[in-house]
Amino acid sequence: MVHCAAFFRGATAEQAHAVNDLGTQHLARAARAASVSRFLFTSTGLVYGHTGGRPAHEDDPCAPIDAYPASKLAAEGFLLAMEGLDVRVLRLPFVYGDGDPHIEEAIPMMRGFPPAQRMSIAHHVDVAQAVALLLDAPSPAHRVYNLVDDEAPSLATLFASVGEPPPDGSNAERARAFDALMDGRRIREDLGFKPKFPRLADAL
């Protein structure tokens, strides 16, 4: 089973908890009762919180700033402590791809962020590849994996990819919640992951 459902944009803290944490718990219990062999949970790199520009490793402490990543981290904790279910966690970065308006939709929220702030990203194709690799692995060496492409572009570059001027940096404090670069070496070393779109420019 691959569990990707989540409530993110516009969710209150209560809604994020109800859907992303409690909803995941209910689904996991149902999966165990149905003898599901493997349960893959897509989480978020935002669980690490502000990293100060240093890529976060899977074993680093997590300090989520907003309700959404906090609810995802709570769900991770429940799943990883659960007995009788083979759980694998894939922490995703900012996901983009053909026909996906994610970048355009995020522009208003990030308009006040620093233009030089970098963001870990992954193309849809690479997310699908990573999900398949992790789901098919008979016995992965770890239970939690980060997923990132080879290059974390600046927000100015991300904005330019959809023809928008760079963000103005007027709300740098709010941007801290999204300043979460990730280290992607583990999934490459353990599972042989290699992105088909290693850089944003490769997908444009």
Task: Enumerate the language-model features and the residues they cover.
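NAD(P)-dependent short-chain dehydrogenase/reductase
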Residues: 77-126
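Glycine-rich NAD(P)-binding loop of the Rossmann-fold in SDR/ketoreductase-type enzymes
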Residues: 15-26, 62, 66, 70-73, ...
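NAD(P)H-binding glycine-rich loop region in Rossmannoid oxidoreductase-like domains
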Residues: 1-21
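Active-site Tyr-X1-5-Lys
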Residues: 50, 63-88
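Mid/C-terminal beta-alpha module of Rossmann-like enzyme folds, strongest
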Residues: 128-184
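Amphipathic terminal alpha-helices
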Residues: 198-204
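Conserved Rossmann-fold NAD(P)-dependent oxidoreductase catalytic core, especially the SDR/UDP-sugar
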Residues: 25-67
